[in-house]
Amino acid sequence: MNNHIEALSYYLGAFVDELTRLNVCDVVISPGSRSTPIALLMEQHEGMNTYLHVDERSAGFFALGIAKAKKRPVALLCTSGTAAANYYPAVCEAFHSRVPLIVLTADRPHELRDVGAPQAMNQINLYGTFVKQFTEMALPEASEAMYHYARMTTQRMIASACLAPQGPVHLNFPVREPLIPDFSLESLWDKGRGEYTGVVQQGNAVMPSEYVDSLVGRLSHMEKGLIICGDDSHSEIATFATQLAEKTGYPILADPLSNIRSGHHDKTMVIDCYDTFLRNELLKETWKPDVLIRFGGMPVSKALTQFIKKQTKAVHIVVDESGQWRDPALVATEVVQASDIAFCSALIEKMPVMKKNDWFRMWQHINEKTKETLREMETYDTAFEGRVITDIVRVLPEGATLFASNSMPIRDTDSFFFTSDKNIQVMANRGVNGIDGIISTALGASMICDPLVLVIGDLSFYHDLNGLLAAKLHELNITIVVVNNDGGGIFSFLPQYEKKEHFESLFGTPIGLDYEHVVTMYGGSFSRVNGWEQFREEVQKGATTEGLHVVEICTNRDENLTLHRKLWAKTQDVITTSLQGESK
């Protein structure tokens, strides 16, 4: 028995210690029995920050939010059985949004598998192709070789999570009873520790000089170009993309998640209203770029995606550090395996300065005309969902974070988050674009990003109510704006809306819930606003005070659709008139 406890303590102690040596210092733990030894050792280690979250599905997204904000791997720990299965949605999102998670699942030992033992199921490769790597850890043994193995496996798995493209990894730990480690053991954290840690260093891929020279030569003869920046671009992409735009004269179509629309950098070349004006048929037929250079994930805008698809004669360059073929438009002619920064730097160094021509001025002019028209919605007294975004940005302080939920909030952010000199970070879960786990992801991010305001629809809010527990347990500061249109507002914009007979029951899905009591249960404050002045006051108050604050604004789905269509129609008229004037 003593030999088992000693092996358990030293073996798992070496694993936990190696996590901290590799700067994985945050772990989200859901309570359970089989994970007891790892949980206790993590709580005991002075280098580890532990966060309890009872619901595993919410816990997974909470860890995802911390990792997204810190841009470092975060660990997740749960017991065996369906607890591990509840991590699946967050693991899928982490994989597709390239967020490093270290998923740790406890398991029954091999003799208790496939024999009907309680709380035992097949956890081998549980997450399938949605993790970069899986390993089944060996059972604890008391030997220097096994302590070294525990550390080396930790190093290998963290390296896998952190190398481009980043993503989740899964370690499955079979353990036998008894499960309580012995903290009185001498040198508990030192077993198997070498002088150095095995860290894989990844440098920026060097751009081949021959390719750079060839590309510079081609671009020098292409006056009509576009730079498109999507989600998960490099944090310094704003500086380098704007320099490249200045050199080439190509406008930057900046997705809100690229974080190029706001900040202290020069935004002369930044186009922010393309989602609206690229709906114009005349413009789509007459504006034909020679080349498109894209960084990051595919932008939110469907209008932009459709525009890209139509450019069948253009050169399409997709820059991706991992070399993955991320081209849902199916038009890429070149995929360059390099970091955004390495690519931009190489071109900036060798590109001659190309004068701003009519091409850039056309985009800039139409962008300003569109923005002028869209800003008319700031005069609407009606609870228009697009104005939610502009009014939040108006009162957010410098350095704040806006987290946009999926469905309508991220689309309204795309349409109505205009360029700003304030430094406001925009975040979202755009890996697989689900509405689950949004509250939990935002709460995880709020541990690093303060103040943080989440904009979320009522159905997405309902979907992750359990996530609010983290705000109470860990005393987090967050303001949640619930846009309550009593249902799935995005479906009003889709063809399903025309099927009136079954629309409300299958797509509109009103649930008629009063969230005030739920928010109070989790220790938060709740306000239901009437009017835009009160809305701005409540958001501003929430962003400058501690705790959980939920601000509900009630909207009407049909009215919201009508107002969106009214704005779009007016902008199309303005754009068409402007284009026809230019052609005369």
From Swiss-Prot:
It is an enzyme of class 2 (transferase). One of its GO terms (biological process) is menaquinone biosynthetic process. GO terms for molecular function: 2-succinyl-5-enolpyruvyl-6-hydroxy-3-cyclohexene-1-carboxylic-acid synthase activity; magnesium ion binding; manganese ion binding; thiamine pyrophosphate binding. Homodimer. Catalyzes the thiamine diphosphate-dependent decarboxylation of 2-oxoglutarate and the subsequent addition of the resulting succinic semialdehyde-thiamine pyrophosphate anion to isochorismate to yield 2-succinyl-5-enolpyruvyl-6-hydroxy-3-cyclohexene-1-carboxylate (SEPHCHC). HAMAP family: MenD. This is 2-succinyl-5-enolpyruvyl-6-hydroxy-3-cyclohexene-1-carboxylate synthase. It comes from Bacillus thuringiensis (strain Al Hakam).
